[in-house]
Amino acid sequence: MRSLAVAIAIACSVVASGVAQEGAAPQRAPDVIFVPTPPDVVDAMLKLAKVTSSDVVYDLGSGDGRIPIAAAKTYGARGVGIDIDPERVREATANARSNGVADKVTFLNEDLFTANISPATVVTLYLSGPVNARLAGKLMRDLKPGTRIVSHAFDLGDWKPLQTVTVSGRPIYFWIVPPAPRR
């Protein structure tokens, strides 16, 4: 019986260490349900942001990972997906492997409101109006001037987009983080 308990303890620690590598699991429910971005919208978002191989594309609420994976496959960019749902993180990680871009794309099980997004040169979003509005301040504070932001379907509240395009009847909004105001 004791050896069974030891075996269970070892198995649990192995599983726990694998989850820890994906990021500290947030302790709250997702703000939005996962709805995949259609492929033509993914393509349009990355084109609108003018993604290149020197970019680091962060997808907040990355779901199955399709946006960072497309950025890596199509443009050679590095990608980081952040999602609060550990099942989505596992799915996205498997999708990156099956698409041959696991060396360029990372998925983190983190809360998008507390995650470090400062390395991003491009940020993509498909969340909701209220979540985007709450996120706008973090984007302005944490991102470097010149970082491009692209959102599918929802704007950033009072922060007016520089450009809006429509693809298959779906709006896509584009912003560039401005220089910090002088004091």
Predicted feature descriptions by range:
Residues A5-V15:
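Bacterial N-terminal signal peptides
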Residues P130-R183:
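C-terminal substrate-binding/active-site "lid" region of AdoMet-derived donor-dependent transferases
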